[in-house]
């Protein structure tokens, strides 16, 4: 056997698209690597720029992987007999550490930019500033407070409902990210889309299908179909409203906006789950 494979064979080995089995795994690992601080073995890690035009469909699956450390903490805290409030705090802290507060950073930048900029250019300039202003601080506090109240309320109702709702929220919110990213033009030339491309329509549709499939988890946990309907309605309202706001304020999407919609969608979904609950 030759030690120097032909060009054709070499390209098939190096290109993850060439393997119908390896490609989905490669996409999920690339998304986990991009969206979190979870350690990926060097042999499995993607050392090249990820192809999110074709691979962003895996964001919701990555969301399921990313929430595993927080889920483990939630279960361990429950088995130790801790109350709902403590479990919720530990879960939220673990999730923020796992993601590096990536999406919360986007929410804070959006709040500062939209709240403090007088025009489009100034808003985009503020959003690139790494410091957190008053609007960003308020947005961060409110977002963490809302998730604490919502998760602890679900834990008070049912531990299994809280687990199902938490997992589904991580999956659905990241499927919405992909659709949001695909549906809007880039607001700046040096933004996320210029670096990684824009998700294809097929990627966005696949992500939404995966997100929709995660709704089975709350149903299995005896969440009312009416509660899920409210959750979906709230997600759509949040998505449509935030999408219009981004168009009006900066003319499209940025990485910060894509991060912010994840947090907003997660909150909207959890609010809906608590409706019609006994």
Residue ranges and their predicted role:
Residues 105, 125:
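Glycine/small-residue-rich loop that forms an oxyanion/phosphate-binding "nest" at active or ligand-binding sites
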Residues 2-100, 114, 119-122, 129-253, ...:
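Hydrophobic alpha-helical transmembrane segments
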């Amino acid at each position: 056997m030759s030690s120097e494979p032909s060009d054709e064979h070499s390209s098939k080995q190096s290109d993850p698209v060439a393997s119908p089995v390896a490609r989905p795994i490669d996409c999920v690992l690339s998304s986990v690597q991009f969206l979190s601080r979870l350690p990926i073995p060097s042999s499995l890690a993607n050392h090249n720029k990820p192809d999110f035009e074709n691979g962003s469909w895996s964001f919701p699956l990555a969301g399921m992987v990313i929430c595993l450390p927080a889920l483990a903490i939630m279960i361990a805290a429950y088995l130790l007999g801790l109350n709902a409030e403590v479990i919720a705090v530990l879960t939220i802290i673990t999730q923020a550490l796992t993601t590096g507060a990536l999406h919360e950073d986007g929410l804070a930048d959006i709040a500062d930019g939209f709240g403090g900029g007088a025009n489009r250019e100034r808003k985009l300039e503020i959003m690139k500033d790494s410091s957190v202003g008053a609007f960003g601080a308020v947005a961060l506090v409110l977002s963490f407070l809302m998730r604490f109240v919502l998760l602890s309320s679900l834990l008070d109702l049912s531990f299994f409902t809280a687990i199902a709702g938490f997992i589904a929220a991580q999956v659905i919110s990241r499927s919405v990210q992909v659709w949001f990213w695909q549906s809007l033009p880039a607001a700046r030339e040096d933004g996320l889309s210029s670096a990684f491309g824009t998700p294809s329509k097929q990627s966005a549709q696949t992500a939404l299908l995966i997100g929709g499939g995660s709704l089975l988890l709350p149903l299995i946990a005896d969440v009312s179909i009416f509660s899920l309907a409210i959750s979906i309605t709230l997600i759509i309202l949040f998505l449509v409203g935030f999408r219009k706001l981004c168009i009006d304020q900066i003319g499209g999407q940025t990485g910060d906006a894509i991060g912010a919609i994840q947090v907003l969608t997660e909150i909207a979904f959890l609010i809906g789950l608590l409706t019609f609950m006994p």
